[in-house]
Protein backbone atom coordinates (compact mmCIF):
# COMPACT_ATOMS: atom_id res chain seq x y z
CA UNK A 1 0.00 0.00 0.00
CA UNK A 2 1.28 3.45 -0.88
CA UNK A 3 2.44 5.59 2.02
CA UNK A 4 0.89 8.59 0.24
CA UNK A 5 -2.70 7.43 0.78
CA UNK A 6 -4.55 9.87 3.06
CA UNK A 7 -6.86 8.52 5.75
CA UNK A 8 -10.10 10.52 5.96
CA UNK A 9 -12.91 10.74 8.51
CA UNK A 10 -15.83 13.17 8.73
CA UNK A 11 -17.63 12.84 12.08
CA UNK A 12 -20.90 14.80 12.19
CA UNK A 13 -22.26 15.67 15.63
CA UNK A 14 -25.88 15.71 14.47
CA UNK A 15 -28.30 17.47 12.16
CA UNK A 16 -31.31 16.91 9.95
CA UNK A 17 -31.09 15.45 6.44
CA UNK A 18 -34.59 16.05 5.10
CA UNK A 19 -36.34 12.96 6.46
CA UNK A 20 -40.11 12.68 6.73
CA UNK A 21 -41.67 12.81 10.19
CA UNK A 22 -44.45 10.43 11.21
CA UNK A 23 -47.01 13.22 10.68
CA UNK A 24 -46.00 13.54 7.01
CA UNK A 25 -44.06 16.79 7.32
CA UNK A 26 -40.46 16.93 6.16
CA UNK A 27 -37.60 18.12 8.33
CA UNK A 28 -35.08 20.53 6.80
CA UNK A 29 -31.78 19.62 5.21
CA UNK A 30 -29.06 21.08 7.46
CA UNK A 31 -25.92 19.20 6.45
CA UNK A 32 -25.19 20.45 2.93
CA UNK A 33 -21.72 21.76 3.80
CA UNK A 34 -20.75 18.49 5.45
CA UNK A 35 -22.10 16.33 2.61
CA UNK A 36 -20.40 18.43 -0.06
CA UNK A 37 -17.10 18.16 1.81
CA UNK A 38 -17.45 14.37 2.10
CA UNK A 39 -17.87 14.21 -1.68
CA UNK A 40 -14.95 16.61 -2.27
CA UNK A 41 -12.63 14.43 -0.20
CA UNK A 42 -13.06 11.55 -2.67
CA UNK A 43 -11.50 13.60 -5.46
CA UNK A 44 -14.35 12.48 -7.74
CA UNK A 45 -17.28 14.42 -9.16
CA UNK A 46 -19.75 11.53 -8.81
CA UNK A 47 -18.33 9.08 -6.26
CA UNK A 48 -19.78 5.78 -5.10
CA UNK A 49 -21.71 6.16 -1.83
CA UNK A 50 -22.22 3.13 0.44
CA UNK A 51 -24.67 3.46 3.32
CA UNK A 52 -24.31 1.12 6.31
CA UNK A 53 -27.20 1.87 8.66
CA UNK A 54 -26.21 -0.74 11.23
CA UNK A 55 -26.96 1.44 14.26
CA UNK A 56 -30.63 0.97 13.35
CA UNK A 57 -32.70 -2.20 13.59
CA UNK A 58 -32.75 -4.16 10.33
CA UNK A 59 -36.37 -3.21 9.60
CA UNK A 60 -35.47 0.50 9.72
CA UNK A 61 -32.34 0.35 7.55
CA UNK A 62 -34.07 0.55 4.15
CA UNK A 63 -36.04 3.67 5.07
CA UNK A 64 -32.89 5.38 6.32
CA UNK A 65 -31.06 4.41 3.13
CA UNK A 66 -33.79 6.01 1.01
CA UNK A 67 -33.36 9.28 2.93
CA UNK A 68 -29.61 9.26 2.29
CA UNK A 69 -30.08 8.21 -1.32
CA UNK A 70 -32.30 11.25 -1.86
CA UNK A 71 -29.41 13.41 -0.67
CA UNK A 72 -26.41 11.76 -2.30
CA UNK A 73 -27.98 10.50 -5.53
CA UNK A 74 -30.70 13.03 -6.30
CA UNK A 75 -28.89 16.14 -5.06
CA UNK A 76 -25.28 15.28 -5.83
CA UNK A 77 -25.29 12.60 -8.53
CA UNK A 78 -23.51 9.87 -6.57
CA UNK A 79 -24.09 6.19 -7.27
CA UNK A 80 -25.67 4.80 -4.09
CA UNK A 81 -25.83 1.32 -2.59
CA UNK A 82 -26.38 0.01 0.92
CA UNK A 83 -25.07 -2.87 3.01
CA UNK A 84 -27.67 -4.19 5.43
CA UNK A 85 -26.65 -5.79 8.70
CA UNK A 86 -28.07 -9.22 7.81
CA UNK A 87 -25.48 -9.48 5.00
CA UNK A 88 -22.38 -9.01 7.15
CA UNK A 89 -21.54 -12.71 7.25
CA UNK A 90 -21.48 -12.91 3.44
CA UNK A 91 -17.77 -12.20 3.06
CA UNK A 92 -17.65 -11.94 -0.73
CA UNK A 93 -20.74 -9.71 -0.89
CA UNK A 94 -19.30 -7.40 1.75
CA UNK A 95 -15.91 -7.24 0.01
CA UNK A 96 -17.52 -6.39 -3.34
CA UNK A 97 -19.46 -3.48 -1.86
CA UNK A 98 -16.56 -2.13 0.19
CA UNK A 99 -14.21 -2.30 -2.81
CA UNK A 100 -16.82 -0.44 -4.89
CA UNK A 101 -17.32 2.37 -2.39
CA UNK A 102 -15.56 5.73 -2.30
CA UNK A 103 -17.65 6.90 0.68
CA UNK A 104 -18.76 4.70 3.60
CA UNK A 105 -21.45 6.39 5.70
CA UNK A 106 -23.00 5.15 8.96
CA UNK A 107 -26.17 6.78 10.26
CA UNK A 108 -27.44 7.61 13.72
CA UNK A 109 -28.81 5.14 16.24
CA UNK A 110 -27.54 2.63 18.79
CA UNK A 111 -23.74 2.82 18.94
CA UNK A 112 -23.38 0.08 21.56
CA UNK A 113 -25.22 -2.67 19.67
CA UNK A 114 -23.64 -1.61 16.37
CA UNK A 115 -20.05 -1.86 17.64
CA UNK A 116 -20.82 -5.22 19.27
CA UNK A 117 -22.22 -6.57 15.97
CA UNK A 118 -19.24 -5.28 13.96
CA UNK A 119 -16.75 -6.95 16.30
CA UNK A 120 -18.68 -10.23 16.36
CA UNK A 121 -18.79 -10.40 12.55
CA UNK A 122 -15.27 -9.07 11.92
CA UNK A 123 -16.69 -6.06 10.06
CA UNK A 124 -14.63 -3.78 12.32
CA UNK A 125 -11.49 -5.10 10.62
CA UNK A 126 -13.05 -4.59 7.18
CA UNK A 127 -13.81 -0.97 8.04
CA UNK A 128 -10.25 -0.37 9.24
CA UNK A 129 -8.88 -1.74 5.97
CA UNK A 130 -11.24 0.56 4.05
CA UNK A 131 -10.07 3.58 6.06
CA UNK A 132 -6.42 2.67 5.56
CA UNK A 133 -7.01 2.34 1.81
CA UNK A 134 -8.16 5.97 1.56
CA UNK A 135 -11.94 5.67 1.47
CA UNK A 136 -13.89 8.49 3.14
CA UNK A 137 -15.29 7.13 6.41
CA UNK A 138 -18.09 9.26 7.75
CA UNK A 139 -21.42 9.48 9.47
CA UNK A 140 -23.65 11.25 11.95
CA UNK A 141 -24.19 10.65 15.67
CA UNK A 142 -23.51 6.90 16.15
CA UNK A 143 -21.90 7.07 12.71
CA UNK A 144 -19.51 9.70 14.08
CA UNK A 145 -18.91 8.10 17.48
CA UNK A 146 -17.78 4.80 16.01
CA UNK A 147 -14.45 5.90 14.51
CA UNK A 148 -12.93 7.04 17.82
CA UNK A 149 -11.28 5.22 20.72
CA UNK A 150 -14.20 5.97 23.04
CA UNK A 151 -17.50 7.84 22.99
CA UNK A 152 -20.33 9.11 25.14
CA UNK A 153 -23.44 7.22 24.04
CA UNK A 154 -27.20 7.35 24.54
CA UNK A 155 -27.57 3.73 23.41
CA UNK A 156 -29.32 2.66 26.62
CA UNK A 157 -31.83 5.50 26.23
CA UNK A 158 -32.55 4.41 22.66
CA UNK A 159 -33.03 0.78 23.68
CA UNK A 160 -34.71 1.06 27.08
CA UNK A 161 -36.06 4.60 27.51
CA UNK A 162 -35.11 8.15 28.46
CA UNK A 163 -34.66 7.29 32.13
CA UNK A 164 -31.46 5.41 31.25
CA UNK A 165 -28.06 7.12 31.68
CA UNK A 166 -25.57 8.26 29.11
CA UNK A 167 -22.65 5.83 29.07
CA UNK A 168 -19.02 5.74 28.06
CA UNK A 169 -17.97 2.94 25.71
CA UNK A 170 -15.12 1.72 23.55
CA UNK A 171 -15.48 2.10 19.79
CA UNK A 172 -13.28 1.22 16.79
CA UNK A 173 -10.24 3.22 17.84
CA UNK A 174 -9.20 4.56 14.44
CA UNK A 175 -8.70 7.96 16.10
CA UNK A 176 -7.65 8.69 19.68
CA UNK A 177 -10.19 10.67 21.67
CA UNK A 178 -13.53 10.40 23.42
CA UNK A 179 -16.11 11.64 20.91
CA UNK A 180 -19.38 13.27 21.94
CA UNK A 181 -22.16 13.87 19.41
CA UNK A 182 -25.12 16.23 20.07
CA UNK A 183 -23.09 17.98 22.77
CA UNK A 184 -25.66 20.81 22.78
CA UNK A 185 -28.23 18.36 24.21
CA UNK A 186 -28.96 18.34 27.97
CA UNK A 187 -26.48 16.39 30.06
CA UNK A 188 -23.92 15.72 27.35
CA UNK A 189 -21.20 18.12 28.46
CA UNK A 190 -21.62 17.08 32.09
CA UNK A 191 -21.36 13.43 31.08
CA UNK A 192 -18.11 13.85 29.16
CA UNK A 193 -16.62 15.73 32.11
CA UNK A 194 -17.28 12.72 34.34
CA UNK A 195 -16.16 10.17 31.75
CA UNK A 196 -12.84 11.96 31.28
CA UNK A 197 -12.05 11.68 35.00
CA UNK A 198 -11.23 8.00 34.45
CA UNK A 199 -10.15 8.10 30.80
CA UNK A 200 -6.77 9.03 29.37
CA UNK A 201 -8.47 10.39 26.24
CA UNK A 202 -9.19 13.98 25.20
CA UNK A 203 -12.85 14.86 24.78
CA UNK A 204 -13.93 15.94 21.28
CA UNK A 205 -17.52 17.22 21.42
CA UNK A 206 -19.57 18.27 18.39
CA UNK A 207 -22.95 19.99 18.49
CA UNK A 208 -25.66 19.43 15.93
CA UNK A 209 -24.70 20.97 12.57
CA UNK A 210 -20.97 20.60 13.29
CA UNK A 211 -18.57 18.00 11.90
CA UNK A 212 -14.97 17.20 12.75
CA UNK A 213 -12.96 16.46 9.61
CA UNK A 214 -9.76 14.48 10.14
CA UNK A 215 -7.39 13.97 7.22
CA UNK A 216 -4.25 12.20 8.41
CA UNK A 217 -3.08 14.37 11.34
CA UNK A 218 -5.00 17.53 10.35
CA UNK A 219 -8.27 18.45 12.06
CA UNK A 220 -10.85 21.09 11.16
CA UNK A 221 -14.51 21.89 11.80
CA UNK A 222 -17.25 22.01 9.17
CA UNK A 223 -20.18 24.09 10.44
CA UNK A 224 -23.58 24.43 8.76
CA UNK A 225 -24.71 27.86 7.61
CA UNK A 226 -27.96 27.61 9.61
CA UNK A 227 -29.50 25.37 12.24
CA UNK A 228 -33.14 24.31 12.21
CA UNK A 229 -33.04 24.14 16.01
CA UNK A 230 -31.69 27.67 16.31
CA UNK A 231 -28.46 26.73 18.09
CA UNK A 232 -25.01 28.16 17.50
CA UNK A 233 -23.04 25.20 16.15
CA UNK A 234 -19.69 24.54 17.81
CA UNK A 235 -17.01 22.00 18.68
CA UNK A 236 -15.18 21.56 21.99
CA UNK A 237 -11.94 20.00 23.17
CA UNK A 238 -11.86 19.04 26.86
CA UNK A 239 -9.56 17.30 29.32
CA UNK A 240 -8.45 17.15 32.95
CA UNK A 241 -5.10 18.74 33.87
CA UNK A 242 -3.78 18.49 37.44
CA UNK A 243 -7.27 18.20 38.89
CA UNK A 244 -8.73 21.04 36.82
CA UNK A 245 -11.22 20.46 34.01
CA UNK A 246 -10.49 22.46 30.87
CA UNK A 247 -12.95 22.97 28.02
CA UNK A 248 -11.98 24.96 24.93
CA UNK A 249 -13.75 25.79 21.71
CA UNK A 250 -12.17 24.31 18.59
CA UNK A 251 -11.58 26.98 15.95
Regions found by a protein language model. Name each.
Residues 2-45, 52, 56, 62, ...:
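C-terminal and late-domain segments of enzyme folds
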Residues 11, 103-107, 138, 179-180:
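Structural motif
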Residues 15-17, 109-111, 143:
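Short glycine-rich anion-binding loops that position phosphate/pyrophosphate groups of nucleotides
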Residues 19, 114-115, 148:
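Glycine/Thr-rich phosphate-binding loops of Rossmann-like dinucleotide-binding domains
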Residues 50-109, 113:
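Portal/gating segments that form or line small-molecule/metal binding sites
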Residues 97-100, 120-134:
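Catalytic-core regions built around general acid/base machinery
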Residues 105-108, 131-150:
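Catalytic nucleophile loop
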Amino acid sequence: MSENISKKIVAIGGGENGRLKSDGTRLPYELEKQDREIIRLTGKENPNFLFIGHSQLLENQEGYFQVMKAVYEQRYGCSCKDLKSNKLNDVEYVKTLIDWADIIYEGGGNTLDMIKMWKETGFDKTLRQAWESGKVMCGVSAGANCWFKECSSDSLKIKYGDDQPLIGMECLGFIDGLFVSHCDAPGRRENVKELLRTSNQVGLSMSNCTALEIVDDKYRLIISDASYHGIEAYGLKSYWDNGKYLEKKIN
